[in-house]
Amino acid sequence: MDYVLSLLGPLAQGATVTLKLFVITLLLAVPLGLVLALARVSRWKALSAFVNGYIWLMRGTPLMLQMLFIHFALPFVPVIGVRLPDFPAAVVAFALNYAAYFAEIFRAGIQSIDRGQYEGAKVLGMSYGQTMRRIVLPQMVRRILPPMSNETITLVKDTSLIYVLALNDLLRAARGIVQRDFTTTPFIVAAAFYLVMTLVLTWGFQRLEKRYAKHDE
């Protein structure tokens, strides 16, 4: 028991890095995903096609590969030539990748709204922006909560990929202790950390779903 307690400090430090990446990614990817979704359903076919290509690229290639490209290959790209530090490179990769996934969730939510509501809003004199803001998006939020919950939980687990950039996240901290002490106990404790984080997220999304369900009654 004393050994397990001694692991909490180092693993908590790693969990801090994990949570930091998780929060920053959400703050960037959710609004970017919404913008991409609105562009995806836009009447401008060129814009819609461009966004569709972006989503295809980000969803069709591994997140780890994107992260390695941004960190190691970006400096050699003409015009850009910027080398990002480890953590910012991870943030950029995660935000761009998850924005594509969130965009598809938002797009499905937007397109699930009955077309008659758009026509009704038009009769009332609402602009496209007002229709989206007052009618479509509020209903969309309620419908996308389950897939958003799944994707957000996946994000927590995907943060472990940043070990390839030598960032001392939760998994890397556990791995270092395992190699030092020749025991798998740190992995079990790290798993408990991940389970607690996903449990909190699951509880939060369930509360949101219940709250919206009450409004529908």
Regions of interest found by a model, annotated:
Residues M1-E217:
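Transmembrane alpha-helices and adjacent helix-loop boundaries
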